[in-house]
Amino acid sequence: MAAISVSSSPSIRCLRSACSDSSPALVSSTRVSFPAKISYLSGISSHRGDEMGKRMEGFVRSVDGKISDASFSEASSATPKSKVRKHTISVFVGDESGMINRIAGVFARRGYNIESLAVGLNRDKALFTIVVCGTERVLQQVIEQLQKLVNVLKVEDISSEPQVERELMLVKVNAHPESRAEIMWLVDTFRARVVDIAEHALTIEVTGDPGKMIAVERNLKKFQIREIVRTGKIALRREKMGATAPFWRFSAASYPDLKEQAPVSVLRSSKKGAIVPQKETSAGGDVYPVEPFFDPKVHRILDAHWGLLTDEDTSGLRSHTLSLLVNDIPGVLNIVTGVFARRGYNIQSLAVGHAETKGISRITTVIPATDESVSKLVQQLYKLVDVHEVHDLTHLPFSERELMLIKIAVNAAARRDVLDIASIFRAKAVDVSDHTITLQLTGDLDKMVALQRLLEPYGICEVARTGRVALARESGVDSKYLRGYSFPLTG
């Protein structure tokens, strides 16, 4: 450095100022001028033939190498950025009006775009399954913010654990007579089901992981897809073989040799009066136990016939199913749910997923309201910039489906009985361990409730459920009007 300080060359003075700056950007920009300086000094040494120029040339080369090594070591010593990947977050909350808006607001204020969201309610509690893209460190900060919300009981990121993940999709596709055979072949290949048949259209129900959904959509594109409605992803942890049974208290039918059956309390109160989940009743908090008792005085959430107008009931309240097409941008869910929250609507069901058009998402929600109030709500939703379409499917014939994953505590002796019950409801076993079995079921609410009632004696450990998804029937057949009527007699 002494040689540099006594030199009067302008290029060397520039080098001294660059060496005194610790900024990597300045070092790299100064290094660009070194070849010019070296060639300049080489020309001086060859012209004069003295050794002073050669020494200066060697000195500049050594300084250039040191600066290059320093900049490389500084870049390599920097902490590597964590990778951005998809995260599955489970949020267990107490059911309260405006809760969805508050949770969506936490993600919106941090610029996260929720890729899918499924909300399944169970009387006074709800389980949110949210899929977002982000880094580990920032997602951990979001989880800490969610835990500060009132009535949020448990928040957990289950992305890195072995899990059973499922999704439900309804696809309405053009089906002309010449292409119907190929479509039915694809339905059998992907183990899908046809839920509605019209003259020139088919509505197909598909369940599986997100990769299967993409494959089905890609193969049906050539037939022109009319509409797609998807639930968010739901997930349950896979139980390890040989592990100790954490759910033995749940199952009286599977473990009848137990001397004492301790009553299972889903929630307990702390000293401060806050409600916290019992540690022994959950495998990790990603799902919630189902209550073994049912109060007939409480309205069943998502009941298709809840609040129907009768001679004794003149309020006109009923469950309305709304379908919205919105832009797929960060914060749009917070804006839409804010309209419901400001008007005091308690959302009973919510399913958010990608629509048939790129950049568009479809929101399917169920709210209790009168026909008059819903018409005003639809007008308010149309005023939002990011909302393209709003349809009230309540008074139209529509296909509705829900997806449920349910984990039952069974041993080897009771496993056969549970599988027999599952076969009646066309449920599938998706995971089996020494002490549990996990079933997958699709259908309407009545089907879900009926299966839960039959499985309660065996011990229901955990339940993950999507909200309701619906598409209007192209056939125009409404099965509601066929209920309660006997088949016509033929002579």
UniProtKB/Swiss-Prot annotation:
Q: Give tissue specificity per the record.
A: Highly expressed in leaves and stems. Expressed in roots, flowers and siliques.
Q: What is its main location?
A: plastid
Consequence of substituting G331D: Decreased feedback inhibition by leucine and valine/isoleucine
Report if keyword Repeat is assigned: yes
Which domain of life, per UniProt?
A: Eukaryota
* SUPFAM superfamilies for the chain: ACT-like (SSF55021)
Pfam families named among the record's database cross-references = ACT_AHAS_ss, ALS_ss_C
Q: Where in the cell is it found?
A: Plastid, Chloroplast; Peroxisome
Q: Does the keyword Disulfide bond belong to this entry? A: no
- After gene disruption, what is the outcome? No visible phenotype under normal growth conditions. The double mutants aip1 and aip3 exhibit a lethal phenotype; they fail to develop adult organs, are chlorotic and die.
Pathway this chain belongs to: Amino-acid biosynthesis; L-isoleucine biosynthesis; L-isoleucine from 2-oxobutanoate: step 1/4; Amino-acid biosynthesis; L-valine biosynthesis; L-valine from pyruvate: step 1/4
> Which positions in this protein are listed as binding L-valine?
D95, M99, I100, N113, I114, D328, V332, L333, N346, I347
Question: What, per the annotation, is the impact of changing F340A?
Answer: Decreased feedback inhibition by valine/isoleucine
> What UniProt keywords are attached to this protein's entry?
Amino-acid biosynthesis, Branched-chain amino acid biosynthesis, Chloroplast, Peroxisome, Plastid, Repeat, Transit peptide
Q: What is this protein called?
A: Acetolactate synthase small subunit 1, chloroplastic
The species this protein was found in? Arabidopsis thaliana
